[in-house]
């Protein structure tokens, strides 16, 4: 029914109500004028007429108010529906405008990434960063674009020549160890080789990637920076958690305070890189080259450094707790006050390494090469040094309590004042070693070679321990122990 018809019907109802009310009033007033009626009856009829009229008009008023209230409610409902539709249309238009704006800014920035001028490319990178910040739904897409830009424009250049191989670089330090020859001029040149400066646009892309909002990163997605040449990159305090950097060259890069936890750096090069206080928790550095890198106070707990080259690297006060360093090269590395508790250093090369006051508690060093290393004041309690090589190693006042040195070679090692409580030296070689003032309480010296060994001033050394060992007349025993007869008779 149209609004005009509804209004006409309402007008008819109003008119009929008014006529009905007036008719009742007229009737009651007419009845009140009958001459046969008493004055009291006339007054009664008139009062009844007025009351009836009032009731009719009050009822009419209530009906009209109810009607108009319903009409107002209906109108407001229609208005709300219309407003909701307008709002929905407005939101759709806003989304369309936003999508158009994103597309324009997005495509404009991407188009400029291929510009010939580095300034334009750099500006495009920062424009993409702003898009990622303003429109979080595009965050990961932009990160993928930037990583692809780095991979495309800074791909690794495979260096030619044997001198570039990690094992060859490590050999430089090998030649410097005791008795080694001086490196050739060519090797010295490689040692001090200057790395090329990173391109401005590549640095900008890495900066944007490194300071992105991690909360917007999707789960199970990784930044792909494989096989990239980002030498001398400034990655100070950047966040590259879980990034894929396999085969990347970060030589000379500044990674101080960066977070590389969970990163895959297998086969990566970090020659002379600065990783001071860097987080590499549970990172994979399998076969990585970290020659001469600064890893002081770096957190490498649980990291995989299997076959990694750390020759000459500085790891002062570094955390390597539980790390895997199987067959790692740590020649001439500095590990003073480092935490290597529970680490696996099986067959690792630690020739000439400095491990003074390091924590090697419960560390696995089976077959490790520690010749010429410095372990003064180190904690090796419970460590496994079976078949380890410790030629001329300095172990002053070190803690070797309950350590296992079965078949270890300690020829000419210096263990002055060492704590050997309950240590096992079964079939170990201590020939010409210096154990002056060492604590031998409950140590196992069964079949240990003690020819020329210095044991003067040894503490808690008992005769039965000496009888189990293999010494000779050159063995220097404490004053309170007499050499066994067969020792004195040996040539």
Where are these regions (language model features)?
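Hydrophobic transmembrane alpha-helices
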Residues: 14-43
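Hydrophobic core/packing positions within alpha-helical solenoid repeats
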Residues: 128, 202, 206-209
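Positions within the helices of HEAT/ARM-like alpha-solenoid repeats
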Residues: 52, 56, 77, 119-121, ...
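Tandem repeat scaffolds
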Residues: 215-491
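Membrane-proximal alpha-helical anchors
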Residues: 37-145, 464
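Alpha-solenoid HEAT/Armadillo-like helical repeat scaffolds in large eukaryotic proteins
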Residues: 108-113, 131, 145-156, 188, ...
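Juxtamembrane interface helix immediately N-terminal to a transmembrane segment
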Residues: 1-21
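Residue-level signature of the C-terminal ends
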Residues: 131-135, 149, 153, 170, ...
